[in-house]
Amino acid sequence: MSKKIIVVGGGAAGMLAAYFAAAAGNKITLLEKNEKLGKKIYITGKGRCNLTNACDVEELFLNVKSNSKFLYSAFYGFDNSMVIDFFESHGMPVKVERGNRVFPVSDKSSDVIFALQRALKEKKVEVLLHTEVSKLCYEKITDTKADEEATDKKTELKITGVILKDGTKMDADAVIVATGGLSYPSTGSTGDGYKMAEDAGHTVTECTPSLVPFNVKEEWVKSLQGLSLKNTAISIYSGKKKLYEDFGEMLFTHFGVSGPMILSASASIKQSLIKQPLDMYIDLKPALTQEALDKRILREFEEAKNKQFKNSINKLLPAKMIPVIIELSGIDPDKKVNEISKEERNRLLMLFKKLQSGCDCCAGIDCDDGKYIGRRDHL
């Protein structure tokens, strides 16, 4: 039997929810408060939109930082290969890049949105832009199977539609809330869904940053703005307690550090574990042990023994980083390499292996509150 379903939110999740609900034979209305659909998609992946990852689906769970079991049915119900097939079948070919990252062949996130819009049109989904939902509509229902004489009859809320910001009521047999979180207010992610979920009886946890860059207090970071490092390792500590370590890519910004490895760190570090300011240690040469790196530096110094120090480490570091490392080492940049002491060389070695910086480092609906597996709130 066909149902009238309202989808709140026109991002990637909302558009896909609307498509599949319509494909099941339902009449769908998609409500989006912005002037266009997929506003956040436009800026995803630096404007290229990293759609998914082409790894084995089991690997995806390893990158879910908490409660990965909650996503088993979702991942296997519409896995990464299905995502790729969906977009290619709607006129958007994809390519797989380093790290199994999947992008549109065109490198344009707008093509992702166009493919989703074609899919919605194909299923005759009604799309209403500039339409903001203020709250859900409910009616109380009582479990009729309960003993008529019982005093603790079970009462639930049945959602019957939505109220728009202008006061208009829209009736529906079911409502799908796909508003996103509180991550990027200028794109429409203003946390509306949290209030709706809370009103529906769900537990909403405290919101804290996740998948975000880190601010770094050291001034030298600003001079490295735009520098991207690959094959680098980081370790993050709160006092003596190690909270996170990883290997991969990072990017220096005007305020600190970002990049895949840093974003993953921000998602992994629980605020409850942070008892004092964080310290991050960057290993610029993780493939080499300290002893092996020392030998490498000695070889470079031997080849450049008559050169000034500032001209001797260009094979070891990106050009933009050399002035920073020289300053932090405390070695006179004009000093001849053959005059550098073992103590000075050891200081340089430690900067390569443990470049230290201080940094400032997730929320949503609690998936452990017993209300999610198999529950749909009569939506």
Label every PLM stretch briefly.
Residues 71-81, 99-118, 128, 184-188, ...:
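Short beta-strand to alpha-helix junction loop
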Residues 128-130, 323-379:
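A glycine-rich dinucleotide-binding beta-alpha-beta segment and adjacent secondary-structure elements
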Residues 129-147, 152-158:
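A conserved short coil-to-beta-strand element within the FAD-binding core of flavoproteins
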Residues 3-30:
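N-terminal Rossmann-like FAD-binding beta1-loop-alpha1 element of flavoenzymes
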Residues 35-37, 42-43, 51, 57-58, ...:
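An anion/pyrophosphate-binding glycine-rich loop and adjacent beta-alpha core
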Residues 22-46:
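Glycine-rich FAD pyrophosphate-binding loop
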Residues 6-8, 169-183, 197-198, 250-253:
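Short hydrophobic core segments
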